[in-house]
Regions:
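A polyanion-binding, active-site-adjacent surface
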Residues: 2-172, 176, 182, 186-188
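C-terminal capping/extension of enzyme domains
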Residues: 1-11, 16, 151-166, 185-258
């Protein structure tokens, strides 16, 4: 079982630092900020292996009317759900919002869902895929509707975001963390700092797609594996999923950390 109350209080303390950040307060008065927290399914804590998917930053997540931690956490806990999971992805899969966006349109969510469905088959999980996995982002705060992480926000708060993600790892305790944040020379920097924060050790680099165009970097830290790959946008999705699954299956079958 996940100790939700302790998890919540640990995160609340860190989100409060964002809410009193002078630069973020100035930004929020001109351009709305949105906040997100990691989501997990009802069956996640009892699942083996436990898989957490990570993106860079969420655009269009919860947007508070005022920048205050009590609005984020008190009452209905608008950005942290107790096992609510990602049912919303299935519920809105092909239903455009007011901006015309829907999860089925996103390569990121297509790969996430496809991989989760394959994990259900592989490990005989009996219910819907979203009950068994978790999803979050490196950056917990972003400019609303920004299509990519705001470097203005992210670069000065890397350490704080790393501390937040470390809390996620402590309470959710995933066996595998899938980082769709970039693994090439020009994109790897996004997750490099966090892997250094954990003293992670690279154990493998698996090529996928012809001519070694893309790779999945495999790291080990604190009893869990991190698979760092490219964002699915513009990449072959089926081979991406297939390569990830082969890595997970091999490590889960042979590694004593399970």
């Amino acid at each position: 079982m996940i100790d939700f109350d302790s998890y919540r209080e640990s995160l609340k303390h860190l989100y409060e630092k964002l809410c009193v950040d002078d630069e973020l307060i100035r930004i929020h008065t001109k351009t709305p900020l949105c906040f997100s927290a990691t989501e997990w399914g009802d069956c996640f804590s009892d699942t083996n292996p436990r898989v957490l998917f990570l993106g860079k930053a969420n655009n269009g997540a919860y947007r508070p009317k005022r920048l205050a931690v009590d609005e984020l956490f008190d009452g209905n806990d608008l950005i942290l759900s107790n096992g609510g999971g990602m049912k919303w992805i299935d519920d809105t899969w092909d239903c455009p919002n007011k901006c015309g966006w829907y999860p089925g349109r996103s390569p990121f969510f297509r790969v996430l869902r496809k991989m989760s469905e394959e994990l259900c088959d592989l490990y005989h999980w009996k219910s819907s895929w979203y009950k068994y996995v978790a999803y979050g982002n490196f950056g917990k705060c972003n400019i609303d509707a920004n299509p990519s992480p705001s470097m203005r926000i992210y670069s000065d708060r890397e350490l704080l975001f790393a501390e937040m993600l470390n809390v996620d790892l402590k309470y959710l305790n995933p066996n595998f963390v899938i980082c769709f944040t970039g693994s090439g020379d020009s994109t790897f920097w996004f997750s490099k700092m966090f892997l250094g924060y954990l003293d992670a050790v690279e154990t493998d680099c698996v090529q996928w797609i012809g001519d070694n165009r893309f790779c999945i970097r495999v790291y080990h830290a604190r009893g869990r594996y991190f698979l760092v790959s490219e964002h699915p946008q513009g990449k072959p999705e089926d081979s991406h999923v297939e390569t990830m699954l082969k890595i997970i299956e091999k490590l889960w079958r042979t590694d004593c950390t399970k």
